[in-house]
Amino acid sequence: LKRSDRITSDYSDASATLAFDIKQGSWSREILQRLDVPEEILPECYATTEPIGRVTRAAAEATGLAVGTLVVNGGGDQIMQAIGAGAVNPGMATVNIGSSGQVCFQCDRPIANPRLNTNTFCGFSKERWITMGATMSAGLSLAWFNSLFPHTDYEELNREVAKIRPGSGGLVFLPYLNGERTPHVNPNLRGMFVGMNPETDRYQLARAVMEGVAFSLRECLEVCWDLGLTTSELIASGGGARSAPWLQIQADVYNLPLRVSAVEEQAGLGAAIAAGVGAGIFKSINEGCQAAVKYKEEMYLPSKVNHELYTEYYQLFKEAFSATRGVMERAAQLGRATGVYY
């Protein structure tokens, strides 16, 4: 919805198009010319905290906002998520489980990855960048699984999953329901369970789903670590941060402490902080984070014993992928041939 009389973008979203000159901070005329895209159809680009107009009468009637309210540019979802989580300085990182999942590192320079299996975006200022690894089906995997058992709510699921020992009784889940981004960049991968037996129950399967998503996010972390990025802890966000067993699974799989934001909608908080800077309420993003970002008291600390066990399961996870990659791709091909378009 257009709230002011200007159509704009910010540097983070613009940089995600691959048609943005990050050195000049403007659209790349060379790329646009090669693609035959007229520059005049693209929005003007400004910083995340830049005021770009005021609420028009039409927008006020549609939203209930007051006419003349200041409109600040804002930014891409992961940039706002990082601000709302307080991960705004180099060496800080977030792990997000929504429908998809992301690991995002705050950087003071653009990180080039010759393997092309991560994303690097402009950040909320010229001194900040985000490097991101992403898995396609994180919370989506658990939502899909739970939809098969409509009488089980998430509270019950979490309670029962917490009772199951790490490893889910020898199960491994490959969470490739929608293909995969980091590290495989392959739309033709498909999900599967490995290791089921007659004693396997739905709660073991559910825990295996959580563990499989965590293994996939560990792959994202390892790609970022190979690029020289490090962190001493992760700030958890998204719907996955509401699940205590899933948080503990992640801490054990990554061998890193997890801190949890007190606010569930971190991207919304990040947008509010950016607006506060643009409106002059805060002098900087850092000041806004100090004033507004809070964390829950409980941190999730990794268990050495569980991490060692999960390292074995993680190797099995990767071996299962290598052994079945061709099978998954063939299954996707046959599915499309029989009218299943995904």
Regions flagged by a language model, labelled:
Residues 1-9, 13-14, 18-36, 46, ...:
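Active-site core segments that coordinate phosphate-bearing ligands/cofactors
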Residues 40-42:
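A conserved beta-strand/loop element that lines the FAD pocket in flavoprotein oxidoreductases
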